[in-house]
Regions:
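Active-site-adjacent structural elements that line small-molecule/cofactor binding pockets in enzymes
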Residues: 1-245
Length: 245
């Protein structure tokens, strides 16, 4: 993905105004390297490459390449046109508001002649034995992280009330008991019909044992139920809401 931080631009001597063209060109080069052991390539933001080998080669053939987005329609369309899987990060707001990105991605892929492509939802969250414990455990580390980044970008501090509001069924964080997280993943699947869900567990200054317990709950309590329920849905196809305007 293009990323939401800009520190690398002055570090590598790039102009921030070239933000989009840099990403498009770097992705084009990556795909060329993936497709061929020896590469000849030229672009606008780096010296040309003349018949150079790129090593070591990946074990997977082809190397999996996903396009990650947070809120840029052009990137969703680009992934579909190129026939690449899309990873949608939801870090704020109601997830259903992001359904148009899934629609655009799938429509762009179909228009470009590609079949169904993998699509993932990616979000922050934390799991504990009950919802209050999950929120209480995750809040200090979440507050520290969000407010530090917020200060750098001129955002108002995040309050506990706003943080807790994101834990509801229609909120953006997957924080709660195993059953709450199950319900939320399945609700999002109704909206997006995605193939993969990635949970970024809040860590940072959190107690390591609690993080390990959250991972255990995700693997033993949440994932099996979600897989079972989605298998039932797959056996009974319904209209995909993320492909309908």
């Amino acid at each position: 993905g293009r990323g939401s931080f800009t520190e690398s631009f002055p570090l590598f001597g790039y102009d921030l105004h070239d933000y989009d063209s840099l990403f498009a060109e770097k992705l084009e080069l990556l795909l060329a390297i993936r497709a061929s052991e020896r590469v000849s390539w030229s672009g606008s933001h780096r010296p040309s490459i003349e018949d150079r080998g790129v090593y070591p080669r990946p074990v997977q053939d082809p190397l999996p390449v996903w396009v990650a987005i947070g809120g840029t329609p052009k990137s969703a369309a680009r992934a579909g046109i190129l026939g690449l899987p899309l990873a949608l990060a939801i870090i704020g707001g109601e997830p259903a508001r992001f359904a148009p990105f899934a629609q655009l991605f799938r429509r762009s892929a179909a228009d470009a002649g590609h079949g169904p492509l993998p699509f993932s939802i990616n979000a922050h969250g934390f799991i504990a034995d009950d919802s209050q414990q999950a929120s209480d455990d995750a809040w200090p580390a979440s507050q520290l992280l969000m407010n530090r980044i917020g200060r750098e970008r001129g955002f108002a501090p995040v309050t506990r009330e706003a943080y807790d509001a994101g834990h509801g069924l229609h909120g953006h964080t997957f924080t709660g008991s195993p059953q709450q997280v199950i319900d939320k993943i399945l609700y999002n699947h109704e909206v997006f019909r995605h193939d993969r869900f990635l949970l970024q567990i809040i860590a940072g200054s959190m107690d390591h044992a609690k993080v390990m317990h959250a991972i255990e709950l995700f693997g033993t309590k949440v994932a099996p139920v979600v897989r079972s329920e989605i298998a039932k849905r797959s056996a009974t196809p319904v209209a995909d809401p993320a492909t309908s305007d």
